[in-house]
Amino acid sequence: MSSQLNDPTPIPAQSSLSFTQGFFLLGQLSVVLLIAAFIKFFIFGEAPPPPSRGLSHRSATHRRSNSIFSSAQHDGSTRTLREKPSNSNVLRPVPSSATNTRSILRKTYYTAIPTNPSSKHGRHRIHHSSHQPESLDWFNVLIAQTIAQYRQTAYLLKDSPTSSILNSLTAALNNPEKKPSFIDKITVTDISLGEEFPIFSNCRIIAVDDPNSDGGRLQALMDVDLSDDNLSIAVETQLLLNYPKPCSAILPVALSISVVRFSGTLCISLVPASTPPLDTPSHSPSPPTAQTTTAGRSKREDQTSGSHSHAGGSSKEPSGENPPKTSPKSNVAFSFLPDYRLDLSVRSLIGSRSRLQDVPKVAQLVEARVHAWFEERVVEPRVQVVGLPDLWPRMGRTGVRTGDDSETGSNVPRSSTAADASGSARHEDSSREPEVLRFGSLLGTRPPFDLASRTSSFNVETGDLRSRSMTREESNGNLSDQFHMPGSLPGSGVATT
């Protein structure tokens, strides 16, 4: 009994770590596991594929397919990171399958099926598209804004001695190399740039077989329609009879040409920089003139003197002899199909005392000449090639769009001269009403037409400025349309009857 009381009871062994210490260690272990998982799956893991830009229910035909050159490009990128590239191997070549017509149509989800494979009259075979024709309402708005800006700019520069459209047309019409000797100086008496805008519609993309490009080339066809009675030009000149002696007889002639309606199919295509230039057939080479002969003789003399000086050892390198070479640029070519429609209204007035009005034969000759001029320039197979501008962002062309409500810090440091100029120009624009660009030159008084027709007549009379806008007045019981141009010089006016 006593021995049992003397035996000590065994004490259970206590843990060396408390609950708090164990919880802290467990938290550290979990943080280490999270960091390891983050490093493994987020830093060293593969990049996820880029999200699709299209809708989730896009059909299988509109899904992008992996390029067959993806693996080759991936290997090339890995190799260029390890190896030092040479100067001639920096720019990677573009695969031909990525720039041909089929690849472009596939990547832009446009279907072009050859439904008309037969060729006609030796022309390129056209592959018509099964894609539905598209409307061009947005394009019409942009074109209308551009034309409106051109009209306003031409009106504001009407008094400029160098940039005026009147001076440009006068110089073009009086070109001595093209104007016959029996026609006196041609004077432009009236110009109207119109009020309406062309309407483009029914745009479609076709594939055309072209031997100069791999896989052919793409061409945009769109219908264009313009109906504007105010698109006109009026000129005056004199026919000279040089037999039996020069200027033995003079016959005054006045013409007014208006474009009533134009409709046709516009073709637009891109011409790459590597494509050889298009050859446009010309009728006959221009005969050598005195200026060209003198220029050729002086050039030969310069070459001869340069060779002698080079032989003597005292020659210098000519500066600026060769024109600077520019890099080839991509061009856009546009033309009209031969099935266009151009309706003109030609009015004529021939004679000084006993006048002949609206002679049908004169109208036919003028219309035939205008059609020939148009077909020689922009009707298939002739095209107009225009160089595309440089679209690379440059600081010299950087501007800031200013607003009326808020002023940004970048547009604050403007000169007071520019602000005053813009304010005065804005004040002039608000005080004017340039509905139609119509102005005349300062010439002598001509007897008016004995017709009460539309505003396309072109007689010029001297008078004072009576109103701020173009108005019509009736005086002396006769119907006389007196046009006054706001901002024109005193003593000028355009009168029509």
UniProtKB/Swiss-Prot annotation:
Every copy of the SMP-LTD domain together lies at: 132-389
Please give the record's comment on domains: The SMP-LTD domain is a barrel-like domain that can bind various types of glycerophospholipids in its interior and mediate their transfer between two adjacent bilayers.
- Name it: Maintenance of mitochondrial morphology protein 1
Could you confirm whether the keyword Transmembrane helix appears in this record? yes
What interactions and quaternary structure are annotated? Homodimer. Component of the ER-mitochondria encounter structure (ERMES) or MDM complex, composed of mmm1, mdm10, mdm12 and mdm34. A mmm1 homodimer associates with one molecule of mdm12 on each side in a pairwise head-to-tail manner, and the SMP-LTD domains of mmm1 and mdm12 generate a continuous hydrophobic tunnel for phospholipid trafficking.
| PANTHER family assigned | SMP-LTD DOMAIN-CONTAINING PROTEIN (PTHR13466:SF0), TEX2 PROTEIN-RELATED (PTHR13466)
Alphabetical GO biological process terms: mitochondrial genome maintenance; mitochondrion-endoplasmic reticulum membrane tethering; phospholipid transport; protein insertion into mitochondrial outer membrane
Its gene? mmm1
- Here the segments flagged for biased composition (Basic residues) are 55-65
Stretches of Low complexity bias are at 305-315
GO CC terms on record? Answer: endoplasmic reticulum membrane; ERMES complex
Which species is the source of this protein? Aspergillus fumigatus (strain CBS 144.89 / FGSC A1163 / CEA10)
Record-linked PROSITE patterns: SMP
